[in-house]
């Protein structure tokens, strides 16, 4: 079956910094991401992203959630983040028996309240999926504002960069 036509990507006005909640999935929803080697490759890829800030990420077995924003260039699309990130992970891992699903899901976070709700959603995802009993026990979470594995207590602590 052919894929439905895709809408062209949109960019927002330049007057305000933007933060997105982005979900990337593994093709066929294969459970390959919750692995120490893959997690290291993901962290390396995020550190190599030059045009995007990653405020937090939760890596699930078959998908990953990110809270991201462009550093300075307002003309960037979420597709630029997804493409660049996937390429960097692939380069870091070398050959892999799996591939990323095409595209991504993204949601523009319009307020601190929205940012907080998505942060909590991502943090609690391993609990909802029955992988751990407490979110703090999930090893495949990090942010680049606080200590790895520790979430900011409020969106303003996440310092929208």
Name each region found by the language model.
Residues 1-161:
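Short catalytic/metal-binding and nucleic-acid-binding patches
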């Amino acid at each position: 079956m052919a894929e439905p036509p895709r809408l062209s990507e949109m960019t927002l006005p330049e007057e305000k910094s933007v933060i997105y909640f982005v979900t990337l999935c593994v093709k066929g929803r294969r459970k390959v991401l919750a692995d120490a080697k893959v997690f290291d490759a993901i962290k390396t890829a995020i550190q190599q992203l030059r045009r995007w800030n990653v405020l937090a990420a939760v890596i699930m077995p078959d998908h990953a959630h990110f809270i991201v924003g462009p550093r300075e260039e307002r003309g960037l699309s979420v597709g630029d983040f997804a493409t660049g990130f996937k390429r960097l992970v692939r380069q870091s891992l070398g050959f892999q028996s799996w591939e990323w699903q095409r595209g991504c899901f993204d949601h523009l976070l319009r307020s601190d309240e929205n940012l907080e709700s998505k942060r909590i959603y991502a943090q609690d995802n391993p609990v909802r999926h029955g992988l751990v009993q407490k979110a703090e026990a999930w090893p495949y979470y990090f942010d680049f504002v606080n200590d790895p594995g520790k979430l900011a207590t409020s969106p303003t602590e996440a310092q929208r960069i």
